[in-house]
Structure formats: structure tokens, C-alpha cells
Amino acid sequence: MRVIMKPLRRTLVFFIFSVFLCGTVSARQIEWQSCMTSPYSDWFGKESSSPELLCGYLSVPLKYTDTGKDVSDENIPLVRLAMTKLPAKSKRKGSVIIISGGPGLPGINPYINFDWPVTNLRESWDIIGFDPRGVGQSFPAINCQQSNQERLVNVSEKQLILQKINACIHNTGAEVIRHIGSHEAVYDIERIRQALGDKQLTAVAYSYGTQIAALYAERFPSSIRSIVFDGVVDIDDLNDNFSWKLRQAHSYQETFDRFAAWCARTKSCPLSSDRNQAIHQFHQLLLKLHNSPLTDSRGESISSDDLISLTTELLLWRSSWPTLATAVRQFSQGIVSNEIETALNSSIASEKVSDALGVILCVDQSDEQLSQEQRKSRKKALADAFPAVNFEREQSDLPEFCELWPIHRDLQQTRLKNTVLPSGLLFVAHKYDPTTPWINARKMADKFSAPLLTINGDGHTLALAGTNLCVDEAVVRHLLFPGKSEDITCQGSGTGDTN
């Protein structure tokens, strides 16, 4: 999921070795073991996993040629992808690979509700999860940790960014980072398919994962059996980073407007149904927190940045709107309840995930250098597109993280514009999705001549979650019987609530 990032307020301390193995990958095998055994029992932290879940590693090349073949060297550097398998309950027909979002989100414990109709899928299909290269339990992982000794004091914001970049490259290794992006991720999917013994790929991709799946569809059209894309990235927009950011910002503001109208109608928080008035009220609250942060029960401050981070995350799912409304109401009253403290703690992505997101996005982008005027103009356009969270009138001319990032592998240069259209694709999108706008799915469905499932409501990604029977039935039907899907609309949360 591409998110509008704000500074993290809590730090997760971690340590990951930044070396990689060497060897050959001809075997392409995964030695499955119970996830309850060492060393896999520590993979999931506090999360629970099924006792039936199997774990293992798949070794793949650190670098591929432009055609996806191994670099010609018997002692090539390898990365290890952390893999999980929930075996089919009866006779196996194949595997369904779950491609997680982010970039930077782990995928070894995918959230899938196996009630009916999803249970039909589980009957004959293995469910495969994996942590993408550089992420989670895969090895080596992106590591941007800085020790206290490495953190310079009394330096400019630009120097702080450069300090962070240097830590990422030094800890992870420049050669690893050079091959950590979407180009390699596409070929990793192909290696996973081969290792599983599947003749063709069956997969469900979420958010950023749809970018990997769409690039795979371009490069390996004949290797596809069935893919579902939920929360769709427009891969034809990847050559213009500013355009997709601008479209995302507009979508976030539209969702904020719908949230404010819902809030006013239900009297859940002190926001007006009038768009301009609601924005003004939210600005007043942000200014209040900016000038006088609240304090939680642990003595940590809650600032305007924290409310912005909470807002951009909780706007994503309609089921989270009541929590966001409570936060707005309580912060307006100078109150912080245990419920909101919990929401703040759970909403802040770990530093590990945030680092991976930033590094992978930057590696995928072209090396674009902006003048001061261009930079300020773009920042103003983004602020105007999502005015609700942009309460500070002065636009900084400070370069962004990716502009200062030195290692790029322009994703557009590695794409294969295949004229053969794959079959078996289904695109899924909420009508009101702030982070991957519905229009992305419409464009990609048209590009691949594929059906589109529109969820008429607010949200971001829903397939196989067990919260919308219409969606799950359509998705399972497509996975079991690809090629028979047509355009369909399912009713979602928020239908008819706001105009």
C-alpha cells in the first residue's frame, strides 16, 4: 500500500545481518517444516498462526539478467525468501500465492478468512505466503538502523535524511539494495511458481502487490492461470511519480470529505458536513496539537504528526472510521483514552516496515533532480490536493527522501511491453479507495481486457477477508474457474451514506 508518510514517533529496535549467501539455485526446492519448530517459531512474533502452517526458505539469485536468467556464475550471491504453506485439505490441485502490499509488508501470515466460500478454495489448493526480498524474515533484510553514536546532533533536516540513507546502504549493502526492487520481485514470483511445481501461476495480489503481479503479467503472459488484483496500482503511471502521488492525494481528500459528512450526520465527532468548514475545524485541531501536544499514559507526546498518521491510516477502512471519530472528538477535548492510545500504537508502522517501504520505492524510481521552484510547486500542488492534513501554509523546499537517494533502477527501463495479453485476470477495487483510486483498476482492466469487480463503498482491499460475501464469492469463483468472470458490482460499506 502506498501511504502518505509522516515521521514515526516510536522506534522498533532490531538487528539483521547484512550479508548474503553464495551458491547455486538449480535445485529450486523448499524444505517444508512445521512452523512450530525452530527456527521458524519466532517468525510470527505475537501473531498467531495455524498449527497446520508449514515454513521454509527458497533461495533465489540476488541478481537476474534482464531476461530473468541467473547471472552466469556458479558461486552467485543468493537471497533467501521466507515461505509459508497452508496445505490443501484434500487432493491438491495447485497453489494460490498471496502477494502482499507495502512495499515492505511481510506476507508469511496472510490474513484470510476461511469461512465459506473461501473454504472451497482451501479444499484443493495450497495457500502460499512469503516475505518479499529485503522484507521480514527473508534474508538479507533492509536495515536502516542507526546507533546513538551514529546519530548526529544539531544538524539540518537534509543532513538527517542523508544520515538515514547512509545507514540504509551501509547496513544492508549497496549491492543488495541495487537488486531489491520490483524488477527482481517479478522474477522471484516466477521462481516461487517453479519451486511449487505449478505449471501456471494462481495468485491474489493486494495493493503494491498488484504492481508486481501486473508486471509479471506483462513479462510472463502464458504462465498465468488466474490472478486477482485487489487495490490496484496503475503500472503505466510508474514513470511519473508525481502524477500518482497527486491522484492519491485527491482520493484521500475525497475520503476525508466522506468521513466528515458521516461524522456530522452520526454526531460522532465535531466536524461539519460542509467541506470547507470541516477542513478548517481539522486545521484548528492540528494547530492545537502542533503548539500544545497531548501526553499519553506513558508520558509520550501526541502531536499533529501523530493525528495525521492516524488519519491517513484509519481513513482506509470504513470499519475504522468510528475509532478515528473518537480520536478527533477526544483530542478536541484534550483527552486520550486507552482505546486511542492502542490505536496510535498499532497504527504506527514499525521502523522496519517503514524503512523497507522507502528503500524499495526509491530504488524503483528514476533519478529525478528538481529545482527549488519545481520542488515547491509540486509540494504546493500536493498540499492543495489533500488540504485537510496540510495546515502549515509555508511549503518547505527540502528535498524528499527519494530525491536524495543515490541508487536507482528505473522500473520503466526494465519493463517488457509484451503484445500478448494474458487471460485469467480479475481486478477488484473500492469505488472510494483513498490510496489506490478506483480509476487505477478501471485503466488496468481496460489495458489487459479483463473484468472489473467494483465494490460500491469506502475501503482498501477486501478479497478473501470474510467481510463481504459478494466479493468473496466472485473472487473464489474466479480462482477456481478462471476466464468466466464478467464485470460485477458488489455493495460495500458506506453505500448511500454520503454524496
UniProtKB/Swiss-Prot annotation:
GO molecular function: hydrolase activity
Residues annotated as the enzyme's active site: 207 (nucleophile), 433, 460 (proton donor)
EC number: 3.4.-.-
Assigned keywords, A-Z: Hydrolase, Plasmid, Signal
Alphabetized InterPro entries for the sequence: AB_hydrolase_1, AB_hydrolase_fold, Serine_prot/Carboxylest_S33
Endpoints of the signal sequence: 1-26
Residue ranges of every copy of the AB hydrolase-1 domain listed in the record: 94-393
Stated family: Belongs to the peptidase S33 family.
Name of the protein in question: Putative hydrolase YuaR
Organism: Escherichia coli (strain K12)
Gene coding for it: yuaR
